[in-house]
Amino acid sequence: MAVDKGRRPVPPERRAQGRKRAEPGDVTIRETRTRPVHTPEPEPELLAKDGILELEDDDDNDDDDDDDDDDKSNHHDGAPKNEDDMEAFPELVSGKDKDDDGDEDEEEDDEDEDEDASDDEAFDSDDLENWDEEADAKYGDADLSDDDDVKEGDAALERMIARARVKPDESERTTNKLGIDTGVAARFYDESRNDDGSKRGRVVQSHVTGMPKVEYPPIEPEYDSDSSTEDVPNRIGQVPLSWYDDLPHIGYDINGRRVLRPAQGDELDKFLDSVEGEGDGWFSAHDKTSGQDVKLTDEELDIIQRLERAQIPVEAYDPYEPATDWFTQHQQTTPLTARPEPKRRFVPSKWEHKKIMKIVRAIRQGRIVAHAPGRERPAFYNLWSDADEARADHPMHMPAPKLPLPSHVESYNPPAEYLFGDDEKAEWEAAEPEDRKLPFLPAKYAALRLVPGYDQALHERFQRCLDLYMAPRMRRKRLDIDDPDQLLPKLPAPRDLRPFPTHTDVVYAHAPWRIRTVSIDPSGAWLLTGPDDGHVRLWDAALGRCVATWDMNAGVARADRSPVYCVQWCPNRTFGIAAAVSVGRVTLLAPPQCGKTMYEASLAHLTTPHAAEDAATAQWTRASEADRAAGVCVRIDVRNNKHASLVPKYVRWHARGDYFATVSPEAAGEAVLIHQVSKHRSQAPFRRTRRAGNSAMAVQCVCFHPSRPWLFVATQRYVRVYDLVQQSLVKTLQPGVRWISSLDVHPSGDHVIIGSYDRRVLWFDLDLSERPYKALRYHSRAVRAVAYHPRFPLFASAADDGTVHVYHGTVYSDLLQNALLVPLKILRGHAVQDALGVLSIAWHPTLPWLVSAGADGDARLWTP
């Protein structure tokens, strides 16, 4: 057996001690060991021929660390159990590998020689056989002590390096219930359980997928159950517990049994609870509902500790979480579409210009002030000053209308007069639902508990919802006026405006014929009436005696006879002439009863001129000597272009008495004709007065201006003012009514009064507006006639309700002051026949007298 020269053999124990590497954190334990004494066995059985026994350095091969660990454990446990364990440590090198590893062995030998030159000495195999263990004991102990010092230094160095390499723990310090750090405190539960006492899961292989999975233990009621679903024994609700201060119980459970008050300990018991046991007294809170001390959980204690440290109660919440810009962190360089940019992207916006100009105008007007000082606020103010103020509603907020309050008929025990009889019940059932006054049948019950359910409740609630959703709402401003009389204008008393007609003085009877028209001559002594029998009657106005009668249908077939539609005296006092229209012609009368001088002047004025030969619209004819002696002077036959007779129904004189106009509503271009008495000539000033198929343009009446050459033409809905000299339209009055019935012009010429079939009387101020100045709605039926008094500030209106309304109307010369209109008197005396009342009225030319003609066949003179 060859042994490497220059090396000192080391016993197996020293070899094992030298190859052992100290681990970081290990604590070296020195102990005295007894070296085992044994008889060496023959070497040829262990080593091959020419084998070499080499001890490698600890730093040469890192793969031997695992073996070192095993030897280390054996070293600490004591002496090796057998010799095989001791001798298995060295590496056995065979002779055939010597050549291959020669260079490596030489390098290792050189290193070993340099390190152990002072310690190792060469000896041969005979020395190994004659090894003296006792002699080498002292030397071995000294060598072991040196090795222990080296290992202690290496272990300290390794610990320093390990501490330098470990990343510092930046997590917050956690403590248990007693305030001790959980890193150094003893665990209450073993490793198989979590800190809260629940069992930990274990990783097992799935039988289905074959993959590892976490298998959790079954839930234990003591640790894993949730107490949030447990029933609370005390079921008193949110009531003050002070109610039970003087009672032995603190409430009732779900079964209605009393929950007795638990025994309460004194201060000594509380102190003992906090000292003895596990210290649960420090982690308990008193529950007022149950009267017991409830132990707080770890989560609740953690929340309390976080609140004490002014931290967020939720541990998982991160207030400083880095914000991730999901939409703009990656710039998109590829466009979605290749469409060219529109022109509006390069042209200034028109709407932005308007908005900017709006702001500029506000700045110029001073509504927007740049750098305006803010409103000064007081340094000290009442914090709760506006706490009780109601919040302002939205500007467009309109509250829903409230439902009507229930009445006696909706009672379950209504009075007998509210109950329906058999006939009323049958009528209610036969009527449509929208025509019924009540949506239900009133019923009577002896007690409220006997009232059945209302079957229409859901339907009524649905209709209410429809009304709130579909019906538009309107806001009406209400005036906060204590005295309603403040709304009425300050008008003078009627007694201060006398004289005006108040009662009937004379009655002119025409029974059974209704009187369509009435007129008083300029002197006021004579009265003309036109009833339906076709005769014009002359009356003495003061006495009420009929003086003369003229038949307007003389020479006309019985089938063509017609009533007298209108009669009008000439306003010229020089002549006593009257015009009456009926059966398609106009008759000029000169009553001889008016006086011989006036009769002769009137007759000469009517019969001297000659009629025009080329008259196409009207034919003037002188009456016979007998007719002229009776008072009939001239007849005018009104014809159209086809020589068909027309029916004029209205006549009106000019203020000078030489012209008068007639109206035929059914005619077209010749509805209005102007006749000149001095020349016996008639003409149509309008070529077309009604459009084809438009009855609203039909002429109803006309009137001359008292001082200007103006003609007022009233159609169904409008009043047009024409200048006859300039042949132009001056203005159009817009009454806003459906059908105009009558028209009259004030003696001053600046005001117009209009009556309509929709029960309204309208006053117009021509200098003020084309709209009505006043609208009087005092009649209950259609207005038939209106008239101004020639001298007094009076005007009147007659309607089908059988009444005549007298008004006071003062017109001021000052244009800045409006007219004063005052209702004075309602004259009642005419009876309504066939829905017709008073058909015509006329004022006395010099006295405050009024004559009215009605459908009852009477004409009445009203005086003060």
UniProtKB/Swiss-Prot annotation:
- UniProt cross-references to Pfam families, sorted A to Z: BOP1NT, WD40
As for subcellular location, the record says: Nucleus, Nucleolus; Nucleus, Nucleoplasm
Q: Can you name a GO cellular component term?
A: preribosome, large subunit precursor
Concerning PROSITE patterns, the annotation shows:
WD_REPEATS_1, WD_REPEATS_2, WD_REPEATS_REGION
Q: Which intervals of the chain are annotated as region Disordered?
A: 1-153, 191-231
Point to the regions of Acidic residues compositional bias. Answer: 53-71, 100-135
For this entry, list what GO says about its biological process: maturation of 5.8S rRNA from tricistronic rRNA transcript (SSU-rRNA, 5.8S rRNA, LSU-rRNA); maturation of LSU-rRNA from tricistronic rRNA transcript (SSU-rRNA, 5.8S rRNA, LSU-rRNA)
Protein keywords: Nucleus, Repeat, Ribosome biogenesis, rRNA processing, WD repeat
Enumerate the WD repeat regions by residue range: 509-549, 559-599, 694-732, 735-774, 778-817, 833-864
Query: Which Gene Ontology molecular function entries are recorded, alphabetically?
Result: ribonucleoprotein complex binding
Point to the regions of Basic and acidic residues compositional bias.
Answer: 1-52, 72-83
Main subcellular location of this protein, as a coarse class: nucleus
Do the record's keywords include Nucleus? Answer: yes
- Assembly with partners or alone: Component of the NOP7 complex, composed of ERB1, NOP7 and YTM1. The complex is held together by ERB1, which interacts with NOP7 via its N-terminal domain and with YTM1 via a high-affinity interaction between the seven-bladed beta-propeller domains of the 2 proteins. The NOP7 complex associates with the 66S pre-ribosome.
Q: Which family does it belong to?
A: Belongs to the WD repeat BOP1/ERB1 family.
What biological function has been recorded for the protein in this entry?
A: Component of the NOP7 complex, which is required for maturation of the 25S and 5.8S ribosomal RNAs and formation of the 60S ribosome.
UniProt-recorded name of the protein: Ribosome biogenesis protein ERB1
